[in-house]
């Protein structure tokens, strides 16, 4: 029920804002006809514009709901440590590490091949040594 009240308030504010814009345009055309183009808008149009803007903004703020906290702890509270810095889109497996970190006995057989050749199999010898 409360959200329909705020939506109605926003509707009234926007309607009043459109009415104020129409009144300002009508006043300007009247000033052109009377050749008094240097006069400002009447105070009632200015006040209607400001009041309509405030009413529309007040209704929009209540429709938007609860604001989030600005500190980072509120966003990080529901994340685990494993997913905090885990970015799978940055994983790269085709890099120069497979050539640089080969065991010394296999370096001699691969010296004739060009580095980063596509036909050589992907060897993660450094990771294999860590798992042993």
From Swiss-Prot:
Which biological processes are named by the entry's GO terms? magnesium ion transport; protein insertion into ER membrane by stop-transfer membrane-anchor sequence; tail-anchored membrane protein insertion into ER membrane
Q: Hey, which stretches end up on the Cytoplasmic side?
A: 1-3, 64-132
Q: Which Pfam families match?
A: MMgT
Q: Topology in the membrane? A: Multi-pass membrane protein
Q: Where in the cell does this protein reside?
A: Endoplasmic reticulum membrane; Golgi apparatus membrane; Early endosome membrane
Entry's transmembrane regions:
4-22, 44-63
Any GO CC annotation of this UniProt entry: Golgi apparatus
Q: Which keywords label this protein?
A: Endoplasmic reticulum, Endosome, Golgi apparatus, Magnesium, Membrane, Transmembrane, Transmembrane helix, Transport
InterPro entries linked: MMgT
**Entry's Gene Ontology molecular function annotations:** inorganic cation transmembrane transporter activity; magnesium ion transmembrane transporter activity
Q: Topology check: give the Lumenal ranges.
A: 23-43
Q: What is the protein's major site of localization?
A: endoplasmic reticulum
Q: Which family does it belong to?
A: Belongs to the membrane magnesium transporter (TC 1.A.67) family.
Quaternary structure per UniProt? Component of the ER membrane protein complex (EMC).
**Physiological role:** Part of the endoplasmic reticulum membrane protein complex (EMC) that enables the energy-independent insertion into endoplasmic reticulum membranes of newly synthesized membrane proteins. Preferentially accommodates proteins with transmembrane domains that are weakly hydrophobic or contain destabilizing features such as charged and aromatic residues. Involved in the cotranslational insertion of multi-pass membrane proteins in which stop-transfer membrane-anchor sequences become ER membrane spanning helices.
Protein name listed in UniProt = ER membrane protein complex subunit 5-A
Organism expressing this protein natively: Xenopus laevis (African clawed frog)
């Amino acid at each position: 029920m409360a959200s329909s009240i705020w939506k109605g308030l926003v509707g009234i504010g926007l309607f009043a804002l459109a009415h104020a814009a129409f009144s300002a345009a009508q006043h300007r055309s009247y000033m052109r006809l009377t050749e008094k183009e240097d006069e400002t808008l009447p105070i009632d149009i200015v006040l209607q514009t400001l009041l309509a803007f405030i009413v529309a903004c007040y209704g929009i703020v209540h429709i938007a709901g609860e604001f989030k906290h600005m500190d980072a702890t509120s966003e990080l509270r529901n994340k685990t440590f494993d997913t905090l810095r885990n970015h799978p889109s940055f994983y790269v497996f085709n890099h120069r590490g497979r050539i640089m970190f080969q065991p010394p006995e296999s370096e001699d057989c691969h010296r004739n091949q060009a580095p980063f050749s596509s036909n050589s199999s992907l060897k993660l010898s450094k990771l294999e040594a860590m798992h042993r």
